[in-house]
Amino acid sequence: MKVYIIDYHRDDPKKCTGRKLIKLNFAELTRYGKGIILDPYSKRILSILDKDIALKTGITIVDTSWNSTSKIEFEKIKGEHRRLPILFAGNPTNYGIAYKLSSIEAVIASLYILNEVEEAIKIANIIKWGHTFLELNKELLESYRNKSENEILEIEREVIEKIIGEP
């Protein structure tokens, strides 16, 4: 499955996981959206139903700083916008924070959800904390894997209710 990176050059180059994916030939740099655009502001959620699109046209990650990105920037990118369901960062900067994943964590999660588990694990192996991310989210990733959008939304709703203590 092709992975593309749009790099806004707003991250510390030494910590930029998108550039690492490109450097190690796990992703290709692009200036335009291709296929599925991972967009944290999207109402639609990535699911197994998106696998055909991802296989044909790839997945695009927008590599930017969480502190300097906006919904408007994502809206300008053409493609099929999807967000990831609730997952927790395993990276040292945002460890344990829901939804605040690094680019490489977003790629790993996307591949896992689309049932490309071997490829997800292969990419997790290129960073020290890749397996931390997988272990931290193992139960969630397995529950999202191979599921439809509605099934994932229901699982996510249940997880959020447990976290905030709603009945």
Swiss-Prot record:
GO cellular component: cytoplasm
GO molecular function, one term: S-adenosyl-L-methionine binding
GO biological process: enzyme-directed rRNA pseudouridine synthesis
Principal cellular location given in the protein's record: cytoplasm
Class of this enzyme: transferase
Highest taxon listed in the record's lineage: Archaea
Record keyword Transferase present: yes
Localization, UniProt: Cytoplasm
KW Transmembrane (keyword) present: no
UniProt keyword annotations, A-Z: Cytoplasm, Ribosome biogenesis, rRNA processing, S-adenosyl-L-methionine, Transferase
Residues binding S-adenosyl-L-methionine: 17, 62, 84, 99, 103
Catalytic activity: an N(1)-methylpseudouridine in rRNA + S-adenosyl-L-methionine = N(1)-methyl-N(3)-[(3S)-3-amino-3-carboxypropyl]pseudouridine in rRNA + S-methyl-5'-thioadenosine + H(+)
The protein's Enzyme Commission number: 2.5.1.157
Cited function: Aminocarboxypropyltransferase that catalyzes the aminocarboxypropyl transfer on pseudouridine corresponding to position 914 in M.jannaschii 16S rRNA. It constitutes the last step in biosynthesis of the hypermodified N1-methyl-N3-(3-amino-3-carboxypropyl) pseudouridine (m1acp3-Psi).
Family affiliation: Belongs to the TDD superfamily. TSR3 family.
Protein name: 16S rRNA aminocarboxypropyltransferase
Upper taxonomic lineage: Archaea, Thermoproteota, Thermoprotei, Sulfolobales, Sulfolobaceae
